[in-house]
Structures are given as structure tokens and as C-alpha cells.
Amino acid sequence: MLRSLQFYRLSSKNLLSFKTCYSFYSTKASSPLPQPSFRRFWKNTATKIQNGEVLIQLDGRNLKSPSGKIVKVPKEMELLAHLIALEWDRLPSTSVRQHNLPITSLVSRAIDISQFKKEEKELLSTQLIRFLDTDTILIYSPETEYEGKLLEEQKENWWPLKETFENKLGVQLSYLDGDAGIIAHKQTQETHERIRNWLSSLNSWQLAAFERSVSCCKSFIVSFMILKGYLNSEKAAALTNLELQYQTNRWGSLEDAHEIDNEDLKNKLASSAILSRCIEDMHDKSNEHAH
């Protein structure tokens, strides 16, 4: 019987702590500080169906998460397993970095969340709700800035997202008017409770996808749109970087730095969108079987 492979426990001169490499909260790609990396030490990748679940194998050994859990997905999400296998199959032979594994690390996070106790899930919800109080989509520029043109773009692009979010979740969101200056901003307790109830309805896969997008784009609202399939990753990144893009169009940019940052954001948001769509497919298949 083949022994499961726990990468971050391997004693190899070429392999740093896999837990560090896999850390979701990574340094941005544009950072001058080098990211942790490790060398490729396998030749073949494959998937294996076992007991209604799909496992990912490298040279016949099961892939494990940093916490030691076997990385596996339900049979109804088999596409996700193939995407993970593809990530590992396409890795270069040297200097593998964590941003090369966006889907793998996201699935690993979902597996960890599935083991959370009630208190841990509540803490995660509290952390996510804080992003709604400082949501990018709810903070508007002063009318005097850029002759009010940036504010016009924000209202045109962001306001529909705010209204959709409010209608779907039955809440009324307050927003920060730039003309009011820098002041504390927080949603009502009633809104927080409704949002908490919605978060409690999400499964571990949905929470992992949502957590990643929230942390990347700093917007609870945009992340909700990605999870529900209302926005693709390209559009979500553009909406998140609306102010930066406006300034870039006006003043120019540090080309390489901005491009790398934007690609890194789109890459992470795309992994959240992919997982969200796989979850939808799984639910659709379950409904088909039920009928």
C-alpha cells in the first residue's frame, strides 16, 4: 500500500516548509522580498476515484494539505480534482512558488474549514463581516477630487452592486461619502446579524472561496457577486481597482508593478470563481439525482 505523501514534512534540501509555501496570506507577486519556493520532485500526476471521492496523486502517492489532510473532492466536483492535478503537472522543475498553486491551496483551505468547530466558524464570520464596514464599494471619493469624474465612475459602476447586494440579502447598507471626510464607518447591528446568518448558511467550499476573494479584493460585496456568479474574475478585479485604474489613466503607472499586482489579483479571484462554479455544478447534479 502506497504511503500518502505529506510534502511539508519531507526532509529535502530542495524543499522549504510546504506550509509556508501554501500560506494563503502570501506576499504579493510584486514584492521585492522573495517568496518561499521548492523544487519539483515528482514526475507523474493523476486522479483516483475512491469511495465516491476523487484524490490527487503524485507518483502514485496522495497529495496532502499543510495540515496533513488528504486533498480530495466529491465525485460531483471531479473537474476540480483534474484542475488541481493540472496545476501540479504544469509546475516547472525548479523554483515552484505558492502562487503557482491557487486552486490547490484553496481546496486545502476548504478542507481545513470543514474541520472547524463552531467557535472557529463564528470567528471566521466575524473577521469577514469586518470587511463590509470598510468595503471598497462603499467608500466614495469627494466630489471635488478629479473634478468629480472619479465619483461619477464609482457611482456608475459600484452603486448597482450595492443595490443588488441589498436586494439579495434584505439589508440596507450605509456608505461613506467622501465629502464628509475621514470618519468611522460601520453597518448596523441588524445588518451584521443578517450577514452572519447568511455566512452560516455557506458550506466549507463556499466559505473558502468567499474568504479568499474578500481577502484579495477587500470587498465583501464584490466577493458575494463572484460567489453567486454575477461577476467574473476579470470584471471583479477591474471594479476593485477602479480608483487605481482611473489614476493610472490620468497620471500613468509603474508598469511592471501594477501589471503584476493586477495579474496576481485576477489569478486569486479566478480560483475563487472556479471553485464557486464547481460548487454550483455539484448542487445542480444533486438536484438532478433527487428528481
From Swiss-Prot:
Keyword set, alphabetical order: Chaperone, Mitochondrion, Transit peptide
UniProt transit peptide range: 1-10
UniProt GO cellular component terms: mitochondrial matrix; mitochondrion
Predominant location category: mitochondrion
Pfam (any one): ATP12
Compartment(s) where it occurs, according to its Swiss-Prot or TrEMBL record: Mitochondrion
Keyword Zinc carried by entry: no
InterPro entries named in the record: ATP12_ATP_synth-F1-assembly, ATP12_ATP_synth-F1-assembly_N, ATP12_ortho_dom_sf
Keyword Cytoplasm: no
MF annotations from Gene Ontology: unfolded protein binding
Lineage top rank: taxon: Eukaryota
A biological process term (GO) from this entry: mitochondrial proton-transporting ATP synthase complex assembly
PANTHER family: ATP SYNTHASE MITOCHONDRIAL F1 COMPLEX ASSEMBLY FACTOR 2, ATP SYNTHASE MITOCHONDRIAL F1 COMPLEX ASSEMBLY FACTOR 2/ATP12 PROTEIN, MITOCHONDRIAL PRECURSOR
Similarity annotation: Belongs to the ATP12 family.
Protein function: Essential for the assembly of the mitochondrial F1-F0 complex.
Protein name: Protein atp12, mitochondrial
Gene that this polypeptide is encoded by: atp12
